[in-house]
């Protein structure tokens, strides 16, 4: 890990601790997916809030690799953890909303993310905790998250870190190799991977946003499209002009 990244991490940890204290929260909660991003956030919270942290593994058709990865994380990092079975409410919602998960993959997948969000915030309210997001800079920049799903959080610690930074931090925090080596995925449906959906690798995107790589015309168009079409995800809800003199 570079000295610059280590200094950033130290500042981030001090800022996060102070933010939680100033919010008068008792601790933090993190959704644990088995991916490297959530692993790094979980490891950081274990360090900063050893007693007052909670990680949730929320089961909705989770893969065997998801199970192995989250189990390894909880055991190796000694995380406070709760397992939550969201399969019954997920099935009930599919039926109530007449969603066919085989024909409407993204609709059903985003429903999973929003159910997990509701679970995280319910536990946060129960314990007076803040919800920590796990998205990195690439995901936020390209809108690679579910609006009001995994994009919903109180604090986003990794928002200005590239994927390569996250991998470096995973080594620093002694994240299990199983987690580090697996292909990044949002786990919204079987076989999904981040890079296949984005159309570029994280390495390419890291280099591009640092100004070290010129993309092909096709890939540049893909990045431009993803950024433009996801702008609404990075903005507050649109409002009309005020009727009165006071502001929100």
UniProtKB/Swiss-Prot annotation:
Pathway: Cofactor biosynthesis; NAD(+) biosynthesis; NAD(+) from deamido-NAD(+) (ammonia route): step 1/1
CDD domains given in the database record: NAD_synthase
EC number: 6.3.1.5
Signal sequence range: none
Gene Ontology BP terms: NAD biosynthetic process
The protein's enzyme class: ligase
Binding site for Mg(2+): 37, 139
Source taxon at top rank: Bacteria
Any one GO molecular-function label of the UniProt entry: glutaminase activity
Sites where the protein binds ATP: 31-38, 134, 163, 185
InterPro entries referenced in this protein's UniProt entry, alphabetically: NAD/GMP_synthase (IPR022310), NAD_synthase (IPR003694), NH(3)-dep_NAD(+)_synth (IPR022926), Rossmann-like_a/b/a_fold (IPR014729)
GO annotations of cellular component type: cytoplasm
Catalytic activity line of the entry: deamido-NAD(+) + NH4(+) + ATP = AMP + diphosphate + NAD(+) + H(+)
Entry similarity comment: Belongs to the NAD synthetase family.
Subunit structure: Homodimer.
Protein name, as recorded: NH(3)-dependent NAD(+) synthetase
């Amino acid at each position: 890990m570079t000295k610059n990244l280590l200094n950033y991490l130290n500042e981030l940890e001090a800022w996060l601790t102070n933010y939680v204290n100033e919010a008068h929260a008792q601790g933090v909660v993190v959704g644990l997916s088995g991916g490297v991003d959530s692993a790094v956030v979980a490891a950081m919270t274990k360090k900063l809030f050893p007693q007052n942290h909670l990680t949730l593994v929320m089961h909705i058709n989770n893969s065997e690799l998801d199970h192995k990865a989250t189990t390894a994380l909880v055991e190796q990092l000694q995380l406070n953890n709760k397992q939550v079975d969201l399969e019954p409410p997920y099935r009930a919602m599919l039926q109530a909303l007449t969603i066919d998960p085989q024909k409407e993959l993204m609709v059903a997948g985003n429903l999973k993310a929003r159910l997990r969000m509701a679970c995280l915030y319910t536990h946060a309210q129960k314990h007076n905790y803040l919800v920590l997001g796990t998205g990195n800079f690439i995901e936020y920049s390209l809108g690679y998250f579910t609006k009001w799903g995994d994009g919903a959080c109180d604090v986003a610690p990794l928002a200005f870190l590239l994927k390569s930074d996250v991998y470096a931090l995973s080594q620093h925090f002694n994240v299990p190799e199983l987690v580090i080596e697996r292909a990044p995925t949002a786990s919204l449906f079987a076989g999904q991977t981040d890079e296949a959906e984005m159309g570029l690798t994280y390495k390419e995107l890291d280099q591009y946003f640092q100004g070290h790589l010129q993309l092909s015309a096709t890939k540049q168009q893909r990045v431009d499209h993803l950024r433009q079409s996801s702008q609404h995800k990075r903005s507050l809800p649109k409002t009309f002009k005020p009727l009165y003199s006071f502001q929100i």
